[in-house]
């Protein structure tokens, strides 16, 4: 099974994938995020954040209030299953999480918490 995915977040405010499938035979799953664009993170920063679909809006709202210096994430937010740091042009970050944190049948969303980005930069994550 493929237990990782490479995701790009660009200057057009888009991820290059909006559906991720995690094979339940994977013990851990890794997301490798890169930013191929030209804009710095204070203008067009991207992160990759995972929560349940039900928790997504709260994570985004509280993240915006937390500000750029906190990567637009509420510190130690228990609703966040996994997240990368916020990156800008030419930067990369990865996150690995335990697949045991996911439940079959639950709806998960991955998204960017930079203000205004989650409307476009979001997708599903499914355990199969």
Curated annotation (Swiss-Prot):
Keyword Aminoacyl-tRNA synthetase carried by entry: no
The reply to whether Hydrolase figures as a keyword in the UniProt entry is no
Query: What Gene Ontology molecular-function terms does this entry list?
Result: copper ion binding; electron transfer activity
Cellular compartment(s): Periplasm
Q: List the disulfide bonds.
A: 3-26
Q: Which InterPro entries match?
A: Azurin, BlueCu_1, Cu-binding_ET, Cupredoxin
| Residues involved in Cu cation binding | 46, 112, 117, 121
UniProt GO cellular component terms:
periplasmic space
The Plastocyanin-like domain extends over: 1-128
Q: Write the signal peptide boundaries.
A: none
Keyword set for this entry?
A: Copper, Disulfide bond, Electron transport, Metal-binding, Periplasm, Transport
Q: What is the top-level taxon of the source organism?
A: Bacteria
| One matching Pfam family | Copper-bind
Q: What does this protein do?
A: Transfers electrons from cytochrome c551 to cytochrome oxidase.
What the entry lists under NCBIfam families is as follows: azurin (TIGR02695)
What protein is this chain from? Azurin
The species is Pseudomonas aeruginosa
